Amino acid sequence: MRASQFFLATQKEAPQEAELASHKLMLRAGLIKRLGSGLYSWMPLGLRVLRKVETIVREEMNRAGALELLMPAVQPKELWEETGRWAVFGPQMLKIRDRHERDFCFGPTHEEVITDIARREIRSYKQLPLNFYQIQTKFRDEIRPRFGVMRAREFVMKDGYSFHTSLESLQQTYDTMYQAYSNIFNRLGLKFRAVRADTGAIGGDGSHEFHVLADSGEDALAYCEHSDFAANVELAEALAPEHPRGEPKEPLREVDTPKQTTCEDVAALLGISLQQTVKSIAVVATDEAGNSQFYLLLLRGDHALNEVKAAKVPGLSSFRFASELEIREYLGCPPGFIGPVGVSTQVNVVADRSVAVMSDFVCGANKPKLHLAGVNFGRDLPEPMIVADIRNVVEGDPSPDGKGCISLCRGIEVGHIFQLRTKYTEAMEATYLDENGQKQFMEMGCYGIGVSRIVGAAIEQGNDERGIIFPAAMAPFSVAIAPIGYDKSEAVQSAAHALYDELSALGIDVLLDDRGERPGVMFADLELIGIPHRIVIGDRGLKEGQVEYQARTAASAETVALADIVSIVRQAL
């Protein structure tokens, strides 16, 4: 492609509202243009990147045996009412009404539509398993669209759905999709991790997320460098300490803490380790009879509550944090001084595993401006009603697989696979006849990739002060030819054209910058848009039969023979 025939729309500065590096750079590089809040046009340069991602996704899905189809973006209300999601999906769903006053939505996802297809078309076990996918624009009415394509209202997604006669068959396809996703991200040249994840609102059983690693990632991940263990922090198990609880050595005593309402402040006042303090978190849950139950969740002072884990404790599936009024009612003191000692039988105490082995610890006294020191289970308060893993793991915790220690990093979720089982097929009565002629509900899997989100995530992972550093598989062009004095030197023009033709004939994506711009402007643009390889041609070098070659990730250029440049580029690619 000749730059004079292309549309390059680079900018020196990014709009002030752009926060993430990817958002700033995509706007500056002219990959996207903002139309409205969370709405972006993919410009020719950006669309080349997006299409390359789509191609790799499509190739790997086809290789895995999935069948591509395309479903309507607009979906009728009636389908969503069958699963109950019309009422519960929330304001993220864009609801529309046609001229006949019939309600529809602009699809945020397609479980209902594909299940409707399955129940209409699949009759026998002989037709299963089947695995469908589509690459399509989705819409979710984000309350605060931000971060460019990372959290846009309109986005491109690959969503896939599989149907099976058994859990074993579902597991086989699930494993195949796991490998296909790994292949996709490896081919894209991204550093990523697949982690066990919570199934969330979509529901079901098994679930894995695929995260591109980036310091700006919204999600915290736990992994072990010495094994394959990796999980979202929401699910990473914090093992119980191996050491037993120590014997009491200190007497129980009250300590004045007039202004200290946090574990950090109390530890600083008393000159003790934060690990010797216990924080008490008051929550309220509703039991099966509809009655409110008050709980104290006990955590070590240096640990943080994991709400996903806590919700899995019996009785806490729908807990909420207690109000100040409720705390005063049950414990008789304001927040900041609450603790488990001396509480009534109406207060249910749940201790994290790390708290259960503590002795001589410090906690709130349930009296204003007072804490207790030298607290011990069995002597000063009963053993906890429940001991469970309710905290986030921290750096250095033992890995749950016993093969080393946990490390933490940040990630951007770009893919998610679920074992939905019969959640949707039961709701929509999607059945088949088994070998005995009996009706059975189909088992179902769900597999999503944020295609447009991948572009933003790749830029978050690869950028510097000069601009974007695209992986080779995603770059809009593989090679840029930068001729100096193009509009003034026939020798430069001739060499540039010859090299352009030779590389293009080899099937290499080449951008020939024939705009006649000054070298500084030309180099800045080519670095900004992230082309992996640059060849500079000038009169001075041509006299010696040489050109300059520089990889986007290299600190400086190197002088090479013009006769060797094609083989150098081919080897680099």
UniProtKB/Swiss-Prot annotation:
Of the GO CC terms on this record, one is: cytosol
The family database entries (Gene3D superfamilies) matched by this protein are listed as:
Anticodon-binding domain, Bira Bifunctional Protein, Domain 2, YbaK/aminoacyl-tRNA synthetase-associated domain
**GO BP of this protein:** prolyl-tRNA aminoacylation
Recite the UniProt keywords alphabetically.
Answer: Aminoacyl-tRNA synthetase, ATP-binding, Cytoplasm, Ligase, Nucleotide-binding, Protein biosynthesis
What are the disulfide bonds?
none
**Where found, per UniProt?**
Cytoplasm
- One matching Pfam family is HGTP_anticodon
Q: Please give the InterPro entries that the UniProt record associates with this protein.
A: aa-tRNA-synt_IIb, aa-tRNA-synth_II, aa-tRNA-synth_II/BPL/LPL, Anticodon-bd, Anticodon-bd_dom_sf, Pro-tRNA-ligase_IIa, Pro-tRNA-synth_IIa_bac-type, Pro-tRNA-Synthase_IIa_type1
Question: EC number(s) per UniProt?
Answer: 6.1.1.15
Source superkingdom: Bacteria
Provide any one GO MF term from the record: aminoacyl-tRNA deacylase activity
**Which reactions is this enzyme annotated as catalysing?**
tRNA(Pro) + L-proline + ATP = L-prolyl-tRNA(Pro) + AMP + diphosphate
Q: Which family does it belong to?
A: Belongs to the class-II aminoacyl-tRNA synthetase family. ProS type 1 subfamily.
Cross-referenced HAMAP family, in alphabetical order?
A: Pro_tRNA_synth_type1 (MF_01569)
The protein's role, per its UniProt record: Catalyzes the attachment of proline to tRNA(Pro) in a two-step reaction: proline is first activated by ATP to form Pro-AMP and then transferred to the acceptor end of tRNA(Pro). As ProRS can inadvertently accommodate and process non-cognate amino acids such as alanine and cysteine, to avoid such errors it has two additional distinct editing activities against alanine. One activity is designated as 'pretransfer' editing and involves the tRNA(Pro)-independent hydrolysis of activated Ala-AMP.
Q: How does it assemble?
A: Homodimer.
About its domains, the entry says:
Consists of three domains: the N-terminal catalytic domain, the editing domain and the C-terminal anticodon-binding domain.
List the protein's name: Proline--tRNA ligase
Write down the species: Methylobacillus flagellatus (strain ATCC 51484 / DSM 6875 / VKM B-1610 / KT)
Name the gene that codes for it.
proS
